[in-house]
């Protein structure tokens, strides 16, 4: 996904495809699962402790930073996927008012404002 800020400092709208969302989710999920197996803790529970500064990370500082980062990516992409799905459902509901809903095989994309 390309993104940029224009000369006036205003964020530009960008698009992200469902393929990009799903690829990011798959990669983030794979990595967070490795950490869950290593530390015997769900990512959600880990992230709660991490966010509150309750972990004595010591020798695990790098692992914990990576785990938190990939978990945040996973959460962000899950939100993107939900927004994309809701937008498609809204369009399908509009179509349904006129009859049958047609689902095309063309890849949907989501416009996002990057912070």
Locate the predicted segments by residue:
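Extended, charge-rich alpha-helical interface modules
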Residues: 2-115
């Amino acid at each position: 996904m390309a993104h940029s800020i224009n000369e006036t400092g205003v964020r530009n709208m960008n698009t992200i495809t469902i393929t990009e969302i799903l690829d990011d989710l798959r990669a983030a999920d794979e990595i967070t699962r490795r950490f869950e197996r290593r530390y015997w803790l769900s990512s959600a529970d880990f992230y709660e402790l991490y966010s509150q500064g309750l972990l004595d990370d010591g020798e695990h500082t790098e692992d914990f930073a990576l785990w938190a980062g990939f978990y945040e990516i996973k959460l962000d992409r899950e939100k993107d996927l939900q927004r994309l799905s809701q937008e498609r459902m809204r369009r399908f509901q509009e179509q349904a008012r006129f009859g049958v809903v047609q689902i095309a095989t063309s890849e949907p994309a989501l416009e996002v404002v990057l912070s």
